[in-house]
Design a protein with these regions (language model features):
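N-terminal nicking endonuclease/strand-transfer module with a His-rich metal-binding environment
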Residues: 1-170
């Protein structure tokens, strides 16, 4: 029996910058032997970044969505990345059309789950050029909060967004 697999990671600014070359396939060579560059053209986006770097896309979304960053430090979390997949047997059994539908449903689930929202997603790219199909979804963890004056704001906070490991169950 196959299972859906979801992995969530938090990334600092420097780590976020390093995500794009792998996710967006900017490089011509990769240390990951599972990447078959002859199949890279089969990869596709469910949300393509408008900018050519995740940092620029992040900055664009911050401005466009009027998000509050608070005080940033070297180890501040800028984005999270969810990788969604299953096992090879599952994808082989359902075929290409249903595989595409699977990732469309994953995207829909993530945009609606905990209010991630499409507007907070930097990129959602499906990789079909590796051994097992999977989607990388990079997003800004946004929560509704109040500023010091009591005004409602939307701020970036991975710790408040996830509220610890128990919030994954909800």
């Amino acid at each position: 029996m196959s299972y859906a697999i979801i992995r969530n990671e938090k990334y600092t600014k420097d780590e976020m910058i390093q995500l794009a070359p792998h996710n967006e396939r900017f490089k011509k060579k990769y240390s990951n032997k599972n990447i078959d560059l002859s199949k890279t053209s089969q990869n596709y986006h469910l949300k393509r970044p408008q900018e050519n770097s995740y940092l620029k896309e992040y900055q664009r979304l911050i401005k466009e969505n009027n998000l509050s960053q608070g005080q940033l430090h070297k180890n501040s979390i800028y984005v999270c990345e969810v990788i969604l997949t299953s096992d090879n047997t599952f994808f082989n059994e359902i075929g290409k059309i249903e595989t595409k539908r699977y990732f469309e449903e994953c995207f829909k689930f993530m945009t609606e789950y905990k209010g991630i929202g499409k507007e907070n997603i930097l990129s959602a790219v499906v990789h079909l050029d590796e051994e097992t199909p999977h989607m990388h979804l990079v997003y800004i963890p946004v929560v509704n909060s109040k500023d010091k004056k009591g005004n409602s704001i939307r701020k970036i906070s991975a710790s408040e967004f996830w509220k610890g490991k128990d919030s994954y169950k909800k």
